[in-house]
């Protein structure tokens, strides 16, 4: 197959669903990978402190472990760890592997203040020596056949140590690196600095995955062109536009790109709510997750605002079920 941009033979592109704490849990991973287009997804981070987690904790955060490390659609799922104590992280990684995990990712990018306050996530970008120590320790203790990867931002306050941190990850023994093209201080404010991903890609000898501000097919083409990466991770854009990965795969496969409409999205919404109820029917989780998702999709679909307004004050699951079914009928007539 020929690349549409370069007219050269096309290299295989990988699309990965990002780990997003409190947003892309196992239910959202299940739904989005069913919709299609993903080659891999990464779990929400499992926080590592002073204890070694039991099997029940691993399955709580990454139930895919019990399904051969795959979502129900068959998409591989990687276990992500967050922490700063190399020995405890290694001990927990070994336990995760003992329970069935077959790939480990390390979080050096989470910008949440509460996480950073406890020396986790992006705060470690101030200490590339510690990053190297963590990666090297885990690589040394994990079985050789277990891939070890990492995700980082461009820095904490600024980008002055971005290349140093990336090299620490590569030299520590990671076999892959995902780069979110902002610093912690920049949060999610545009723009994402895709050109910095290329700088990092050119500085390390491991594959780099590009991440940041991919909300459309054109964004995907842009980040891939500027970064030079053949692997792209989708974050908020995947939730706001549930068919984004599917569109990208249609484009990469040379076929027509089909834009979804809200009639199709309404089916996914109802399916998502049922999956949430299956997971936790007796608390606020299903309603909270539904409203969270609709609140995000309002940016892309005007009809999402209409549906959000209908369910916003409803607290009964059966009433929400009826509203979703009625809305889906309206969308398909």
From Swiss-Prot:
Question: In this chain's numbering, which residues are marked as the site (Interacts with tRNA)?
Answer: 47, 107, 188, 289, 291, 312
Cited InterPro entries: Aldolase_TIM, DUS-like_FMN-bd, DUS_fam, DusC, DusC_C, tRNA_hU_synthase_CS
Give the superkingdom in one word: Bacteria
Looking at its record, which EC class is this enzyme? oxidoreductase
Q: What is its EC number?
A: 1.3.1.-
Q: Which family does it belong to?
A: Belongs to the Dus family. DusC subfamily.
Q: Protein name, please?
A: tRNA-dihydrouridine(16) synthase
């Amino acid at each position: 197959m020929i690349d549409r941009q370069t007219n050269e033979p096309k290299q295989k592109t990988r699309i990965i669903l990002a780990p997003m704490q409190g947003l892309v849990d196992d239910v959202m991973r299940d739904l989005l990978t069913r919709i299609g287009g993903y080659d891999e997804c990464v779990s929400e981070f499992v926080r590592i402190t002073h204890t070694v987690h039991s099997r029940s904790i691993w399955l709580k955060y990454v139930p895919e472990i019990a399904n051969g490390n795959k979502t129900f659609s068959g998409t591989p799922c990687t276990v992500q760890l967050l922490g700063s104590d190399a020995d405890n992280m290694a001990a927990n990684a070994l336990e995760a592997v003992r329970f069935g995990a077959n790939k480990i990712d390390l979080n050096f990018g989470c910008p949440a203040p509460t996480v950073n306050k406890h020396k986790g996530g992006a705060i470690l970008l101030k200490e590339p020596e510690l990053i190297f120590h963590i990666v090297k320790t885990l690589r040394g203790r994990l079985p050789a056949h277990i891939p070890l990867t990492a995700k980082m931002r461009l820095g904490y306050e600024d980008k002055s140590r971005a290349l140093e941190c990336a090299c620490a990850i590569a030299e520590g023994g990671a076999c892959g690196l995902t780069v979110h093209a902002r610093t912690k201080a920049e949060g999610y404010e545009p723009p994402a600095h895709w050109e910095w991903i290329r700088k990092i890609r050119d500085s390390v000898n491991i594959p780099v995955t590009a991440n940041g501000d991919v909300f459309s097919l054109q964004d995907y083409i842009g980040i891939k062109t500027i970064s030079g990466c053949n692997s792209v991770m989708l974050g908020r854009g995947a939730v706001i536009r549930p068919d984004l990965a599917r569109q990208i795969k249609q484009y990469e496969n040379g076929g027509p790109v089909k834009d979804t409409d809200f009639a199709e999205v309404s089916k996914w919404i109802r399916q998502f709510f049922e999956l949430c109820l299956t997971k936790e029917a007796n608390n606020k989780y299903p309603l909270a997750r539904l409203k969270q998702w609709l609140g995000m999709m309002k940016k892309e679909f005007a009809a999402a605002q209409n549906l959000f307004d209908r369910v916003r004050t409803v607290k009964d699951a059966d009433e929400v079920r009826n509203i979703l079914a009625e809305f889906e009928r309206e969308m398909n007539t």
